Amino acid sequence: MMMKSLICLSLILLPLVSVVEGLGGGGGLGSRKPIKNVSDPDVVAVAKYAIEEHNKESKEKLVFVKVVEGTTQVVSGTKYDLKIAAKDGGGKIKNYEAVVVEKLWLHSKSLESFKAL
């Protein structure tokens, strides 16, 4: 009887484990995932936030052009590692790397780093 119970339990739990692993995109909890749609309004909003915060801190006047590429990682919130194209004060388009952590439940974002590439 005990063996039948273990077999039944295994048959129930194994598919559940597979589903949970599948939801993680194959990378596991905390792994980086490429952003498939860099034009997604939420991604663009995070990139614009990064530029606005950088402009405040540095007194530069960068203007957002587009998100070139990026990854997300679930940490204590969502960590965005973005490559952003922006125009500098002279009108030249350059690429920048920004790291932003967004905590939706707290309605907060923080710019962790921003640098020219």
Swiss-Prot record:
Residues 30-115 form the Cystatin domain. InterPro entries: Cystatin_dom, Cystatin_sf. It comes from the Eukaryota. Glycans are attached at N37. A motif (Secondary area of contact) lies at residues 73-77. One of its GO terms (molecular function) is cysteine-type endopeptidase inhibitor activity. Residues 1-22 form the signal peptide. SUPFAM superfamilies: Cystatin/monellin. SMART domains: CY. The record marks G30 as: Reactive site. GO terms for cellular component: cytosol; extracellular region; plant-type vacuole; plasmodesma; secretory vesicle; vacuole. It is found in: Secreted. Keywords: Glycoprotein, Plant defense, Protease inhibitor, Secreted, Signal, Thiol protease inhibitor. It holds the Pfam family SQAPI. Disulfide bonds: none annotated. One of its GO terms (biological process) is defense response. Belongs to the cystatin family. Phytocystatin subfamily. PANTHER family: CYSTEINE PROTEINASE INHIBITOR 4, CYSTEINE PROTEINASE INHIBITOR 5. Specific inhibitor of cysteine proteinases. Probably involved in the regulation of endogenous processes and in defense against pests and pathogens. This is Cysteine proteinase inhibitor 4. The gene is CYS4.
